[in-house]
Every structure is written in structure tokens, then in C-alpha cells.
Regions:
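Histidine-acidic metal/acid-base catalytic patches
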Residues: 17-33, 42-142
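Active-site glycine-centered loops adjacent to acidic/histidine catalytic or metal-binding residues
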Residues: 37
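Basic- and aromatic-lined ligand-binding clefts that recognize polyanionic substrates
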Residues: 1-27
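Catalytic P-loop NTPase motifs of RecA-like helicase/translocase cores
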Residues: 12, 41-42
Length: 142
């Protein structure tokens, strides 16, 4: 059969710790796993390490994404939409924002993908890919 790996995401029905908790509590671990997104969890004000520790046995994939806290604060202070936050550059690659990835790398050792959700006109994709690659190599040795 097919196992579902659910991606929590801002702007959807499952975005914050309470909603993830409810989903995980009401689904069978044999059939439903979690795609954990560091950026989306931090964006909503949660501690990504806490959630990784809690669900490490059900996480099958991680999106490594960082946030720019000053942009997130501006979005929230002005009651702007999540999409507007993305447009303004709330997200970036690991190592270019405020998330401490070291403890996350120590707890989770499975599949990871770098994701930034940035406007390529504002953040050159190659430049940011190189920046992310360098950061991951320095932090993990991979």
C-alpha cells in the first residue's frame, strides 16, 4: 500500500503545534508519517527542535528552511497574509536566518531537502543553493 507523509504548512488546516498534535494523535503511525518543515514551524512561533524530538519516529522527511525573523515580525505586526510574508522574504535557506539547526541535525538523521521559498528575482537561486550547501557541509560534514 501507500503510506502518507503529511506536510504541515502555514496557510493550511494543519500548520501549528496543536494542529499537528491533533493530526498525529488521530492517525495511525503505520499509515501516516510527518514531513517536518523547520521554516513553517518556526514561522508559527513554535520550537522546531521540540517537535522533531516529539515525532522523530514518525518523521520520514524534513524540509530544511530558515526564516528571517524581522520579516515574520513585520508580517504579523501588520496582519499581512502568509503569502505576503513569502513575497517579502520571510523564508531563506538554512544558515541565513535564525533557526539553530545543530540540535535538529543531532536528533533527525533521515531524508532532508533544502527549501527556501524565495523570489528568484530577489535571491539568486544558485547563490543561495551554494550558501545552503556550504552551511550543511560545515554543520554535518556531509
Amino acid at each position: 500500500g501507500i503510506a502518507l507523509t503529511f506536510h504541515h504548512h502555514m496557510g493550511t488546516v494543519v500548520q501549528d503545534p496543536d494542529e499537528v498534535e491533533r493530526m498525529m494523535a488521530n492517525t495511525d503511525p503505520e499509515y501516516v508519517s510527518l514531513l517536518f518543515d523547520t521554516g513553517h514551524f518556526t514561522y508559527c512561533g513554535a520550537d522546531p527542535l521540540e517537535m522533531v524530538k516529539k515525532y522523530v519516529n514518525r518523521i520520514k522527511h524534513v524540509h530544511l528552511k530558515d526564516i528571517r525573523p524581522e520579516v515574520v515580525k513585520e508580517v504579523k505586526d501588520n496582519d499581512l497574509s502568509f503569502l505576503e510574508g513569502v513575497r517579502r522574504g520571510a523564508f531563506t535557506v538554512p544558515g541565513d536566518g535564525c533557526i539553530d539547526f545543530d540540535p535538529i541535525f543531532k536528533v533527525y538523521e533521515g531524508y532532508m531537502l533544502v527549501e527556501a521559498e524565495q523570489d528568484p528575482a530577489k535571491a539568486n537561486p544558485l547563490e543561495y543553493a551554494i550558501k545552503a550547501r556550504k552551511f550543511i557541509r560545515e554543520k554535518t560534514g556531509l
